[in-house]
Design a protein with these regions (language model features):
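Short amphipathic alpha-helical interaction segments
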Residues: 60-75
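Amphipathic alpha-helical dimerization/coiled-coil segments
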Residues: 20, 104-116
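Short, cationic-aromatic polyanion-contact patches
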Residues: 84-107
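A short, conserved structural fragment
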Residues: 74-85
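Short amphipathic alpha-helical elements of helix-turn-helix/winged-helix folds
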Residues: 39-43
Length: 116
């Protein structure tokens, strides 16, 4: 799937997650690690990396939770940081090669599972 279409598909997933949170409550169904990976993947498709401040603003959870999960994802090898401490709103994050590869595999699976 071309990048613009895939980017829009991931944005649809994010909008659906936000709508679900509105209906059922963000605390009940929070999944900050997955939200971070989806946002980082959109950034990878559109411009390469993601500013920590933007990541914190986009989340459905408090900024401290976003930072904690971003640290975990970095430690586990899903994200890389290109400047400053991760707590710094001006830090840049991006998917690691492993993160990008697995997000590609996941979206390919989702797309191939959709009815035509």
């Amino acid at each position: 799937m071309p990048r613009p279409q895939r980017s829009e598909r991931v944005r649809e997933l994010l909008r659906a997650r936000h709508f679900r949170a509105d209906l059922f409550g963000a605390r009940l169904l929070a999944d900050p690690a997955w939200d971070i990976l989806l946002l980082a993947y959109v950034a990878a498709l559109e411009h390469g990396r993601l500013l920590m401040a933007d990541l914190c603003r986009a989340g459905l959870v408090p900024a401290t939770t976003t930072v904690r999960w971003a640290k975990t994802l970095e430690k586990e090898g899903w994200l890389t940081r290109s400047s400053g401490p991760i707590e710094d709103p001006q830090s840049w994050l991006e998917l690691s090669p492993m993160g990008r590869r697995n997000m590609e595999r996941y979206l390919t699976f989702i797309e191939s599972s959709r009815p035509a």
